[in-house]
C-alpha cells in the first residue's frame, strides 16, 4: 500500500485548507489516481489495523440492495449509523441504485450479463449518482460509479470518488472494491486484474492530520491474500464466510473521529 502512503504525504505536503459540509475543515487536493495489481495481493492498509468484517459486510449489504442499517447492525457493523433515520433507513443510497435504479433497473445483474456476453464492451458501468434521488439520500454517494474492463483473461475495475476521506473512508473503499473485483471475476470466468481508484476532492480532515503523520512513521507489511472459499450460484449469493483473507499483518488501529 505504498501508493496510499504516498497519497497521505501528498495531501500533507500540498493540500490546500478548505471548508466542508461538516464544519471540520480539510486539507484538500484535486484529481488523484492509484493502481493496485490484485495478482500481488489484497490492497488492505497495513500501517493501521482495518476491521475486515465491516468491509465485507458493507459490500454484501450494497450488493443485496439494502439501504437499512439494521441489516448491518445484525452483523455488528455500525459504520453507517450516524446517517440513518429512526427506522434505520438511509434513503435510496448505493444498494438501491445498484440493484433497483428508478425502480426498474438492476445494474449489477446487467453488468454480469454483459461481462459474459460482451466483455469487450466499453459500457460496463454501474452508477450510484442518480440526480432524481439525491435529495432523498441521507448522504449522496462518495464513490459514485465504477467501470469494468476485460483484457488478456483478466478483469479490472476502476472506481470514481467525488469525495475521498483519505484517512478513514478510503481504505475501506479500496478494500471493498477489491473484493467486488474478485467476485465479478470469479462469476464471469476471469482472473482478477487491476483495481484503479480515481478521486476528485481528495482530503484529510484537520482532526486526522496527526493520525496520518503517525501512519507515515510505520513501515508497511506485505499485502495479505484473498481466497474465495467457493463459487456461489450468482453474484448475489456470496456469504461472509466465502471471503478467506490470509496473512493480514497490520500495525495497531489508530482512532479518529468520523466527520458527520
UniProtKB/Swiss-Prot annotation:
(6R)-5,10-methylene-5,6,7,8-tetrahydrofolate binds at residues 51, 165, 259. CDD domains: TS_Pyrimidine_HMase. GO terms for molecular function: thymidylate synthase activity. Pathway: Pyrimidine metabolism; dTTP biosynthesis. GO terms for cellular component: cytosol. The active site is at 142 (nucleophile). The keyword Translocase does not apply. Its main location: cytoplasm. It is found in: Cytoplasm. Belongs to the thymidylate synthase family. Bacterial-type ThyA subfamily. Catalyzes the reductive methylation of 2'-deoxyuridine-5'-monophosphate (dUMP) to 2'-deoxythymidine-5'-monophosphate (dTMP) while utilizing 5,10-methylenetetrahydrofolate (mTHF) as the methyl donor and reductant in the reaction, yielding dihydrofolate (DHF) as a by-product. This enzymatic reaction provides an intracellular de novo source of dTMP, an essential precursor for DNA biosynthesis. This is Thymidylate synthase. The lineage of its organism: Bacteria, Pseudomonadati, Pseudomonadota, Gammaproteobacteria, Methylococcales.
